[in-house]
């Protein structure tokens, strides 16, 4: 845990994707200068999937790795004795786990930021391998294809080399294979978009506000669009970031943090909203893609003047 729970404010809960841990997945975002205001006012709990932390020892022979459902069920016992509610930020497998957690504990989750979320049950390994030029049994290569587009794999060599070395050297390979196996054999979330005035109270879907984030060249684009089609449109915004690949919280952190910052602020104290929304400023300057109208209507930004000036002056 980073910081301590403050009054009745929700705790920010993060969960990483396969091949990563909380450091490689979220350090760039939470260490970004303008995110420091968030970390000053909210406690942040970073969760690593079993055995995925750096330097983790291998599991004993015969160990049964938890399923995705079991990892979601493990969350309350790990931290909820100290907090009243959470705002979840998850990437890939972590976004799936936090979605399960929200479906099972709707009163505990105030909102979700889901990056590269896939609600479907189809195995990602076959899909990822099909994106490569030829079949490979190398787990690192398959995970790289899961995270990055073909263009990124060839054009952004510095980023690719950094993550390839991290996945291959910092994460225990046996433990990683077990985590990947659990994600590969996940079940469908079985969520569906409610029909207003007809089945809102009975349909299985996320009841909290959700911000779905994906880069426009990410391998996860189709999956995130599918997830968006299954959620309540009055509580969900799909943000497809322009000129961005598989890890928007890393490669476009100067823009991504604004949406995360704004979303968290709205959820924590909606009564303090101001009318100026910096996203209008960004869109007019051509720096950000236009998010859906739901974002402008439902989630304006707190202290918009200061955020807009910060972001406009940032060198991205």
Regions found by a protein language model. Give the residues of each.
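Catalytic nucleophile loop
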Residues: 94-95, 257
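Conserved serine/cysteine hydrolase catalytic core
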Residues: 171-240, 249, 283-291, 296-308, ...
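Post-His helix in hydrolase/transferase enzymes
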Residues: 249-271, 282-288, 296
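Conserved HGGG/HGGXW glycine-rich cap/lid loop of the alpha/beta-hydrolase fold
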Residues: 1-60
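Flexible "cap/lid" loop of the alpha/beta hydrolase fold
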Residues: 96-142
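Conserved acidic catalytic loop of the alpha/beta-hydrolase fold
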Residues: 68-87
């Amino acid at each position: 845990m980073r910081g301590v729970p403050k009054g009745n404010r929700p705790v920010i809960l993060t969960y990483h994707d396969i091949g990563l841990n909380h450091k490689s997945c979220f350090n760039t975002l939470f260490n970004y200068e303008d995110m420091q205001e968030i970390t000053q006012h909210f406690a942040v709990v970073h969760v690593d999937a079993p055995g995925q932390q750096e330097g983790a020892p291998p599991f004993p022979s015969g160990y049964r790795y938890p399923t995705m459902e079991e990892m979601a069920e493990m969350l309350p016992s790990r931290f909820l004795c100290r907090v009243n509610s959470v705002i979840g930020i998850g990437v890939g497998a972590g976004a799936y786990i936090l979605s399960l957690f929200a479906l099972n504990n709707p009163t505990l989750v105030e909102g979700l930021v889901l990056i590269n979320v896939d609600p479907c049950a189809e195995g990602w390994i076959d899909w990822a391998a099909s994106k490569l030029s030829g079949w490979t049994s190398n787990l690192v290569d398959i995970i790289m294809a899961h995270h990055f587009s073909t263009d990124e794999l060839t054009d952004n060599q510095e980023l690719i080399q950094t993550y390839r070395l991290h996945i291959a050297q910092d994460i225990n390979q046996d433990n990683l294979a077990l985590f990947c196996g659990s994600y590969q054999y996940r079940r469908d979330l079985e969520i569906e978009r409610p029909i207003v005035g007809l089945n809102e109270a009975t349909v299985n879907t996320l009841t909290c506000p959700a911000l779905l984030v994906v880069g426009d060249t990410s391998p996860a684009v189709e999956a995130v669009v599918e997830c968006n089609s299954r959620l309540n449109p009055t509580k969900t915004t799909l943000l497809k970031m322009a000129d961005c690949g598989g890890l928007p919280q890393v490669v476009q952190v100067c823009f991504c943090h604004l949406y995360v910052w704004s979303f968290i602020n709205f959820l924590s104290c909606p009564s303090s909203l101001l009318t100026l929304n910096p996203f209008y400023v960004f869109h007019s300057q051509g720096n950000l893609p236009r998010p859906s109208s739901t974002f402008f209507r439902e989630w304006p930004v707190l202290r918009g003047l200061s955020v807009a000036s910060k972001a406009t002056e940032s060198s991205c």
